[in-house]
Amino acid sequence: MEARLVLGSSSERRKAVLESFRIPFICVSPDFDERSIVYSGDPFEYTKELAWNKANVVRSQGFSDALIITADTVVVYKGEVFNKPESEEHAVEMLRTLSGSSHSVITTLVLMQNEKVLSASENTQVSFIDIPPQHLKTYVRSFSSLKRCGGYCVQDGGGLIIKQIEGCVYNIQGLPIKTLNQLLMEFNISLWDYLV
């Protein structure tokens, strides 16, 4: 591969998803305050702006020639955006709100190299079971909810609360593989060449 590949993310899940391929990359945490971007009502534009800002921050950290991958993921329910919870109580409230209903998980990817910038979004529908109220705090403490958009995860036992998923499961983990590969192919890279 000609270009150095940089995953601009502090997410362990995104890193783990990309590590499932043999593609060489480094992981750089973008020093960017996501709270500086105000949600204006369009989750696709919101996640695109966040991912674009992350990519620019990584580029400014000495990776100007690298192929930079950044992403931002949000949960959307009845027009409201759920990011990472700010406290255990906030996570419990998020899960209580989402319990027994369906919501969208939207991730926008931005790939940036020099002046070439591409982006694409993925939308996955997730339905929750009616989560027993007495298990909400246990769930939050068991699955590092404060590090997860919407306060939940799909991997390991975290999927216990999920009734149905329509769309890309990797999107819920923050790195939709099919969409990522489509963008990488525009830079003459295919994940098919890096299967383990």
Curated annotation (Swiss-Prot):
Entries under InterPro entries matching the protein: ITPase-like_fam (IPR029001), Maf-like (IPR003697)
Protein name, UniProt field: dTTP/UTP pyrophosphatase
EC number: 3.6.1.9
Reactions listed under catalytic activity: dTTP + H2O = dTMP + diphosphate + H(+); UTP + H2O = UMP + diphosphate + H(+)
Active site: D72
Taxonomic superkingdom: Bacteria
Family: Belongs to the Maf family. YhdE subfamily.
GO cellular component, one term: cytoplasm
CDD domains named in the record: Maf
Record's function text: Nucleoside triphosphate pyrophosphatase that hydrolyzes dTTP and UTP. May have a dual role in cell division arrest and in preventing the incorporation of modified nucleotides into cellular nucleic acids.
NCBIfam families for this protein: maf
